[in-house]
């Protein structure tokens, strides 16, 4: 999963809400921050490792990782979001599942419900060759693809024929086009349908008249005594022929290609339907003599018979008749095979039956050609019975002829039937396809449907979209809308979120690895994603300038306008130096290594420094034990100029190198500010930087019922600054404030020792050195002789610290009354019962008790000692300390002994 967006930047912000494309360094950083990448194909999200995509580097997804510029990314994908590490492809999501599995498993399969042609197009888009298909899917894929290609070829031929009907090179193209559609395309309009129905009625009427003219009752004898057509029926036939002639001439005149019109099979049928009538009239009127009429009479009869071909004109209006004609034309191989089988059978069986029946009296099988008729009707299983064999041998031959005829005819007939069925379906499909294409063309001409590339459409309408969104954003300035116009950076929303809520230990190590190596700040990527258009930065800037001219009140540049609701940008810096303090001042004492770091600290404790430390307040909740030390800075310090504000520390990951470098920490209290100085030159022992905790709450668990106030320090997070990250152990710790008017070390002691008692109850703590423990830590129980130890209570993560300056005098009195007890260095852990905690606090100054049952907890010890003693033991290399602030512990009298496990507060 991609790394989460920094808290300073809204995670829901897309690239389309920003003005300029991202820099190459931002694109490279977003790819290197995570081992995984999100791929959104048609709205369906997929998550895959980068190394999985690297298996096919020459494919589209394989090239995705090498694209480091905005233009190269848009050549590979349609859109992207660097904050989410997500890349969008506007393609078929179902086909991509098979393609992504090919990257993972190396096996390419095609889903059963997937169209072969569509799957082939998807393979071409993603850059994968179809030869990688598995054998189980390859045959099905190629079969479907060939079938689809054949259908597309036929449709293309039909469309070429339709597109070949050009009327531009002729006179009156529009009128001729309308007339052609009226006569040739019955479905083009209502008038064309009516005209087709009238034409069919004339065909039927002429056929009926032709049939009735052969009836003797309706015939009339001419002057030569020969029967002739009825006059009334002749008039009906003349009207029909006139209609057919007019239709044929109009079709010929309106046709775009005259030669092609003559070669058309349907047009040939129309010509044969009307030509015999005119030939008969010409022959009859030109030859009036009896002798000449007798010579041409037979020719006239032939042309009269040809008039029956008018019935074939119905094929123009019937898809079934057209399919029959095309089937016979396409099945000429099967028809030829059928005729060949029949001819061979007829020849064989007619010869056999002739030799079997020639010796019989009054036989009808007088010759082999005379036997052809019997063999034909026998093989076709008709059997008229006008001729049949009489002998036994002839009957056997007749039986074999019947069986052979059934087998011979049954072989090619199904092929012909199948061809007819397929062609009929194909004709229906082509008719629907032609209608659909014509409807789309008409809609395109009318402007209803615009056929263009989606990217080009977005690119052309980008200006309109920007202006519309800008106007909509002006009316909604008071609302916290995330989907704001990317040309209005003054209204960008920066969501403030604690880092501990959006990150984990592992994510910190991965996310800021590159930043720690480059030793630079994390650069917020303000150029996420935009719409999938190929707009360059220059075009966007030009559009930006135009909008700023038209809208002078809107300042896209946040530096050019005042924003009273946003505090000024400032940065904090921590000055790390050694502070020379008197012997009574506190310093960090030496401590040994903490073995089980996973249960004692958490990286998320660093991230809790996210709020302001402007004034002290009393927490309404009782502070639990083992909390964290947190600091806070005001947003605007009085009297502090912007040039005096230091820069925040860079974002660094926790170093995993365990080096011997330790840090000496001292707390310097001044009337104006407080500076926590960490000197990396001191060597208290090797550090333990690898203190990442699996669970942030694992280091917060404890059984000590101690109730005191903890110090909280919060870094003021600037809204426009980069998100804060846990500082590295190799960097100084920033602590700077100006709102802490403490002057003495005893004042700090008051802060550390003050209990969270009910209101009205005086503090019970004395200035005794007491021990506070939660049980012996697993693995070690160090002792620190000659140490001044003071209690420092902890609280749960992100809890606020109470600093009540009104009780300073009580603590100073306690300090003066028991000066001898403060010098006691021996640590001691009292094992009193929880019920006797208050008595022990009053009598011995202990601030907490622990039970022996809590020995499995990994306790922590936060110890302060005098600066002089720390300097004295700075040469010791056997001790190790954690790179965090340590709270002091109050120990009991010198006579008491015990083990005080370390208690650590990480920041």
Swiss-Prot record:
Residues 213-232, 285-296, 355-368, 389-395 are extracellular. Residues 1-22, 503-534, 680-742, 761-859, 887-907 are annotated as: Disordered. Residues 813-823, 833-845 have a biased composition (Basic and acidic residues). Glycans are attached at residue 287. It is found in: Cell membrane; Perikaryon; Cell projection, Dendrite. Inhibited by quinine at micromolar levels. Modestly sensitive to millimolar levels of tetraethylammonium (TEA) and 4-aminopyridine (4-AP). GO terms for cellular component: dendrite; neuronal cell body membrane; perikaryon; plasma membrane; voltage-gated potassium channel complex. GO terms for molecular function: delayed rectifier potassium channel activity; protein heterodimerization activity. Belongs to the potassium channel family. B (Shab) (TC 1.A.1.2) subfamily. Kv2.2/KCNB2 sub-subfamily. Voltage-gated potassium channel that mediates transmembrane potassium transport in excitable membranes, primarily in the brain and smooth muscle cells. Channels open or close in response to the voltage difference across the membrane, letting potassium ions pass in accordance with their electrochemical gradient. Homotetrameric channels mediate a delayed-rectifier voltage-dependent outward potassium current that display rapid activation and slow inactivation in response to membrane depolarization. This is Potassium voltage-gated channel subfamily B member 2.
